């Protein structure tokens, strides 16, 4: 009972600061990343089809509204040089620029810049204002344009409004409604720390930025040291990690810095907290500055006060002219940040707000890298001497930057999608033949099962092909059958010797079928169909008759459509579904399993049933016996769960590393099973054990088979964007 006037609540779970399960038990497996973007957090409802809405959008009218906004300077946040274009370019760049090739995470694909931590990264200072300036347009067009698309489109229109012919624009980015907690941003506990390095300067994978809270590099130079040559090393490493080569890197840096300015009118001590830490009255904005007016000529952002060209709102070649024709010396901004000034230049650069004032050209340490790194310098001079080459290179690199995480071109929407196939889009030839039908599928499955290929070989090959898919950047998957090509055919996880034999058998079956039928079957389809045949046979071996769903329509990629260097990033460091784990990785096996499951867009129950099924199907890499808790491998049964949960078995690690375990009979000490951490986590982790108990129950066999087939079918079709709305 409470007295009148006193609050009955002292604390509530809705307030941050309470100790979480993860803080109580830091080594606890994080399964939250397998249940992100729940319909419970999505206000649009289950029936909302963004692709349909976007295709009904009057894109021309929207772009015209954006063009008008560019020069409609607002009193609450005035536009530098009377034009918001440079601000919107930076917003779009920083939205897309978090992408990294190692795991495909980051990028502009779901509008994550609106949420923590990205909305409060030091490198994203003042971009809260850019998004808020867009709100009237987002409000006007509502559901027809996502924030994710609008952010990138605003950058495109900004470039066009300042004289650049862009390469194109593809819509189709669907907004998320919560932070993406699957992304590992680094171990640091403070902004701008760099504990991510080891050795001389080896950047931890999969990270693609030099410090916590930066998009790429420190613009002052490594750790604030104004050394252009050393900065070039960081630039090359980080831009490579987001999929850019040297020519694209030079084009992007020079093209982006053709416009606008950096903001460092005063010391950072005048700047208030970032959006996530700001008071409720700030309404989602942050970095309120008490330095003079706090805006316009008094704005403080990065702390750098740099204007690169004479025409900061027009596309031209000033950037390279200034870079090469002037001599540069280091200086400090009013905020105390290292930058460079053209010591032999006249005052020819305009002031952003006072037309009577002029400045000397200024640049960043990372700009000077394009002159003093010998490889970058050669490229930069070519762009300087050939402005048309530069304009085309920047337009193409910008398109790649802003579309890199969208997957194949078939996912792009709208009238401005370029018709040209680009190698980084992982193109696949269109299907140009009649597809097989049910009778053909049954005939082909019979041929496959009569060929001598085992259940394990069929399941293993289909999984190896399909499980390369990454929901992060929509790369990989079974479509294209790139498992036939380098580099995938040589990955140790794919058992190259066995793979070559399986593919040879399937290719002969394909050849014979295609020779006698007007309908054709691709190798991509046949590999998946073989896996389905294997699962059906395994179910029969376990006493169940089932039909595994199969939809034809895949095509076979060509070698010239496959970027070997780029596809190398899809090679698995670990695949817990096949009990594969490369040596030398410090991340626990079970954590890498969850990471893989998240990239496959699986839920915790789907992950669980797939691991249990793959074990009894004997699908471990190298045919290891770890986790094969059954005396009838090749039969689709729930034996994995029954035996894992058997309390007559006692588990102990084989050594102090606790990566391999032996399960012995508690009474006799007889060795029954061996297991990895991935296997035992399903009995150890309380959440996974709860799911395992469902599948280990006496009445669970039918449910197990049904759920395994459902999850299997999901993985086989993850890259079939032609089957489901965007």
UniProtKB/Swiss-Prot annotation:
EC number: 1.11.1.21
PTM comment: Formation of the three residue Trp-Tyr-Met cross-link is important for the catalase, but not the peroxidase activity of the enzyme.
GO molecular function: catalase activity; heme binding; metal ion binding
Alphabetical GO biological process terms: cellular response to hydrogen peroxide; hydrogen peroxide catabolic process
Active site per the UniProt annotation: 94 (proton acceptor)
Binding, heme b: 257
Disordered: annotated span: 471-490
Entry GO CC: cytosol
Keyword rRNA-binding (UniProt): no
Reaction equations catalysed: H2O2 + AH2 = A + 2 H2O; 2 H2O2 = O2 + 2 H2O
Site feature Transition state stabilizer, where: 90
Task of the protein: Bifunctional enzyme with both catalase and broad-spectrum peroxidase activity.
Protein name: Catalase-peroxidase
Originating species: Methylacidiphilum infernorum (isolate V4)
Gene name for this UniProt entry: katG
């Amino acid at each position: 009972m409470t007295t009148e006037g006193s609050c009955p609540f002292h604390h509530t779970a809705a307030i941050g600061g309470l100790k979480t399960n993860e803080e109580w038990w830091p080594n606890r497996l994080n399964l939250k990343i397998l249940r992100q973007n729940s319909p419970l957090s999505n206000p649009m409802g289950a029936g909302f089809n963004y692709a349909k809405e976007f295709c009904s959008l009057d894109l021309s009218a929207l772009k015209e509204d954006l063009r008008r906004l560019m020069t409609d300077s607002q009193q609450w946040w005035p536009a530098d040089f009377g034009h918001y274009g440079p601000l919107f370019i930076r917003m779009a760049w920083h939205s897309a620029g978090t992408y990294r090739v190692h795991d495909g995470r980051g990028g502009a694909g779901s509008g994550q810049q609106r949420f923590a931590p990205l909305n409060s990264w030091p490198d994203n200072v003042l971009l809260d204002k850019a998004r808020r300036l867009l709100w009237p347009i987002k409000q006007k067009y509502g559901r027809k344009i996502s924030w994710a698309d609008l952010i990138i489109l605003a950058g495109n229109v900004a470039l066009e409004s300042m004289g650049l012919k862009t390469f194109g624009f593809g819509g189709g980015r669907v907004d998320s409604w919560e932070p993406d907690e699957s992304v590992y941003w680094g171990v640091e506990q403070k902004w701008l720390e760099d504990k991510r390095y080891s050795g001389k300067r080896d950047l931890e994978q999969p990270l693609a930025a030099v410090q916590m809270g930066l998009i790429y590099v420190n613009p002052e130079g490594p750790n604030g040291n104004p050394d252009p040559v050393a900065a070039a090393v960081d630039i090359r490493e980080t831009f490579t990690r987001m999929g850019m080569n040297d020519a694209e890197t030079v084009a992007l840096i020079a093209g982006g810095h053709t416009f606008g300015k950096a903001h460092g009118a005063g010391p950072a001590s005048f700047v208030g907290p970032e959006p996530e830490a700001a008071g409720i009255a700030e309404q989602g904005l942050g970095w309120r500055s008490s330095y003079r007016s706090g805006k316009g000529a008094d704005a403080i952002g990065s702390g750098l006060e740099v204007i690169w060209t004479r025409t900061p709102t027009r596309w031209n070649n000033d950037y390279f002219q200034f870079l090469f024709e002037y001599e540069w010396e280091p200086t400090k901004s009013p905020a105390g940040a290292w930058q460079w000034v053209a010591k032999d230049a006249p005052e020819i650069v305009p002031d952003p707000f006072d037309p009577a004032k002029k400045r000397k050209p200024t640049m960043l340490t990372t700009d000077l890298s394009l002159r003093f790194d010998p490889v970058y310098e050669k490229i930069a001079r070519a762009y300087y001497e050939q402005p048309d080459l530069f304009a085309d290179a920047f337009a193409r690199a910008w398109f790649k930057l802003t579309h890199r995480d969208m997957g194949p071109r078939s996912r792009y929407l709208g009238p401005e999608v370029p018709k040209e196939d680009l190698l980084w889009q992982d193109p696949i030839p269109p299907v140009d033949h009649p597809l097989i039908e049910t009778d053909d599928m049954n005939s082909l499955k019979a041929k496959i099962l009569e060929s001598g290929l085992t259940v394990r070989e069929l399941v293993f090959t289909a999984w190896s092909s399909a499980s390369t898919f990454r929901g992060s950047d929509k790369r990989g998957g079974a479509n294209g059958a790139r498992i036939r090509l380098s580099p995938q055919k040589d990955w140790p996880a794919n058992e190259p010797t066995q793979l070559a034999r399986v593919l040879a058998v399937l290719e002969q079956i394909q050849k014979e079928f295609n020779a006698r039928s007007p309908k054709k079957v691709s190798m991509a389809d046949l590999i998946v169909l073989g896996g389905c045949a294997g699962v059906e046979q395994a179910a029969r071996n376990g006493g169940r008759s089932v039909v595994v769903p199969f939809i034809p329509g895949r095509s076979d990629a060509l070698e010239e459509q496959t970027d070997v260097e780029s596809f190398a990033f899809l090679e698995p460091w670990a695949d817990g579904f096949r009990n594969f784990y490369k040596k030398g990785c410090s991340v626990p096996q079970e954590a890498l399993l969850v990471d893989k499951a998240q990239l496959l867009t699986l839920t915790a129950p789907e992950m669980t049933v797939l691991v249990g099924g793959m074990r009894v199907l004997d699908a471990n890499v190298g045919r290891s016996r770890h986790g094969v808790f059954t005396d009838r491998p090749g039969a689709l049964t729930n034996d994995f769960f029954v035996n894992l949960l058997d309390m007559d078995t006692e588990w102990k690690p084989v050594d102090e590393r606790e990566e391999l375990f032996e399960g012995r009979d508690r009474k006799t000490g007889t060795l029954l099973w061996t297991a990895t951490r991935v296997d035992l986590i399903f009995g150890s982790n309380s959440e996974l054990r709860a799911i395992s108990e469902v599948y280990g129950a006496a009445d669970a066999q039918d449910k197990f088979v049904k759920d395994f087939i459902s999850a299997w079918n999901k993985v086989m079709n993850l890259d079939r964007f032609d089957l489901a709305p965007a």
